[in-house]
Amino acid sequence: MARIAGINIPPHKHAEIGLTAIFGIGRTRARQICEASGIEYSKKIKDLTDADLEKIRDQIALFTIEGDLRRETTMNIKRLMDIGCYRGFRHRRGLPMRGQRTRTNARTRKGPRKAAQSLKK
């Protein structure tokens, strides 16, 4: 089993798909990495040589991935919240921040519905 950037890459998958197991690498970037390292992206991970894996590791080292990327994203959101801008306010309240409607929908961001409170007298 190939281990790249601290992640076990599934051996039975093609190189292009297997690399997407790493946080921060999607299909497009995986294809770019394969092309830059001279590896056919339809080749399975288990068929790659150690030299091929080393070339892939060198290419991946050029990008921000995994823990560093998660930390950077978290810090960007925290910065928005600290400066008190609109997007930071929406993050703090757990609402959509890109102009979507919230009267209906927005359930993914707001979470499950709260039960309606009954009025007792």
Curated annotation (Swiss-Prot):
One of its GO terms (cellular component) is small ribosomal subunit. SUPFAM superfamilies: S13-like H2TH domain. GO terms for molecular function: rRNA binding; structural constituent of ribosome; tRNA binding. Pfam families: Ribosomal_S13. It comes from the Bacteria. Keywords: Ribonucleoprotein, Ribosomal protein, RNA-binding, rRNA-binding, tRNA-binding. GO terms for biological process: translation. Residues 93-121 are annotated as: Disordered. The keyword Ribonucleoprotein applies. Part of the 30S ribosomal subunit. Forms a loose heterodimer with protein S19. Forms two bridges to the 50S subunit in the 70S ribosome. Belongs to the universal ribosomal protein uS13 family. Located at the top of the head of the 30S subunit, it contacts several helices of the 16S rRNA. In the 70S ribosome it contacts the 23S rRNA (bridge B1a) and protein L5 of the 50S subunit (bridge B1b), connecting the 2 subunits; these bridges are implicated in subunit movement. Contacts the tRNAs in the A and P-sites. HAMAP family: Ribosomal_uS13 (MF_01315). This is Small ribosomal subunit protein uS13.
